[in-house]
């Protein structure tokens, strides 16, 4: 009985992994954030370098080296929309009107990255003004935002620090979604890492097995009880 139960759970787990979406994280970037000069926390992004190599290269370069002497350090989160996203990275003008990249003012979308669905919080994507207008600005979703699907290059996801993202989301803004008090990237850098497969936050196979174990076991116990009583009835019929 125990062997059969284990096989069912393992088989279900295998099917879940086979059908589950995963991303190859090729590098990790962190950003430290301050609100009105007070530390808020750190965000750690896992970047999808195989899915969006050009976009990841641009983002990493701006973080680590900058363009024309300017990196993301000191730049603001200039757009904060509750229950939607936080947006930053305008290292040109600081207000969402500027654009620059290692490829020029703009660079094209990457088709595979356009196909990623914004079905949960924490996705890192390129802000744009339309197709093929990627530059330096990026956003992080705070909810599932399916209306962005197919319109933006998704190139990473928050691995740690969603509490920091939500803290940014909670700051007071004006009527143009611009924070009243500055929300600034005070530091950023790279965390050495070997590439690994990353499953979205709500897909946790170990947690699924733990969660499934008790219900499946309970179901089998109920079936065994019914089976026992049916056998007893047959003995007296």
From Swiss-Prot:
Glycans are attached at residue 68. It catalyses: [protein]-peptidylproline (omega=180) = [protein]-peptidylproline (omega=0). GO terms for molecular function: cyclosporin A binding; peptidyl-prolyl cis-trans isomerase activity. Its EC number is 5.2.1.8. The chain crosses the membrane at residues 205-225. GO terms for cellular component: cytoplasm; cytoplasmic vesicle; endoplasmic reticulum lumen; endoplasmic reticulum membrane; intracellular membrane-bounded organelle; membrane. GO terms for biological process: 'de novo' protein folding; intrinsic apoptotic signaling pathway in response to endoplasmic reticulum stress; N-glycan processing; protein folding; rhodopsin biosynthetic process; visual perception. InterPro entries: Cyclophilin-like_dom_sf (IPR029000), Cyclophilin-type_PPIase_CS (IPR020892), Cyclophilin-type_PPIase_dom (IPR002130). It holds the Pfam family Pro_isomerase. Residues 30-190 form the PPIase cyclophilin-type domain. Expressed specifically in photoreceptor cells. It is a single-pass membrane protein. Residues 1-20 form the signal peptide. It is an enzyme of class 5 (isomerase). It is found in: Membrane. Gene3D superfamilies: Cyclophilin-like (2.40.100.10). Keywords: Glycoprotein, Isomerase, Membrane, Rotamase, Sensory transduction, Signal, Transmembrane, Transmembrane helix, Vision. PPIases accelerate the folding of proteins. It catalyzes the cis-trans isomerization of proline imidic peptide bonds in oligopeptides. Acts on the folding of rhodopsin RH1 and RH2 (but not RH3) and is required for visual transduction. Belongs to the cyclophilin-type PPIase family. This is Peptidyl-prolyl cis-trans isomerase, rhodopsin-specific isozyme. It comes from Drosophila melanogaster.
């Amino acid at each position: 009985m125990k062997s059969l139960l284990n096989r069912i759970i393992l088989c279900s787990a295998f099917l879940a992994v086979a059908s589950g979406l995963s991303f190859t994280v090729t590098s990790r970037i962190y950003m430290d954030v301050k609100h009105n000069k007070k530390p808020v926390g750190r965000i750690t992004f896992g970047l999808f370098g195989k899915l969006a190599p050009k976009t990841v290269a641009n983002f990493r370069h701006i973080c680590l080296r900058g363009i024309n002497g300017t990196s993301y350090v000191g730049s603001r989160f200039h757009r904060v929309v509750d229950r939607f996203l936080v947006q930053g990275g305008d290292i040109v003008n600081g207000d969402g009107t500027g654009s620059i990249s290692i490829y020029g003012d703009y660079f094209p979308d990457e088709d595979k990255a356009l196909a990623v669905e914004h079905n949960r919080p924490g996705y890192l994507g390129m802000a744009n003004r339309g197709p093929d207008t990627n530059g330096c600005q990026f956003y992080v979703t705070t909810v599932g935002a399916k209306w962005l699907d197919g319109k933006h290059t998704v190139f990473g996801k928050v691995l740690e620090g969603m509490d920091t993202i939500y803290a940014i989301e909670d700051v007071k803004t004006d009527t143009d979604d611009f924070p009243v008090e500055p929300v600034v990237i005070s530091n950023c850098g790279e965390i050495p890492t070997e590439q690994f497969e990353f499953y979205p936050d709500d897909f946790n196979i170990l947690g699924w097995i733990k969660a499934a174990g008790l219900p499946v076991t309970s179901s089998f116990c109920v079936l065994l009880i019914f089976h026992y009583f049916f056998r007893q009835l047959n003995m007296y019929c």
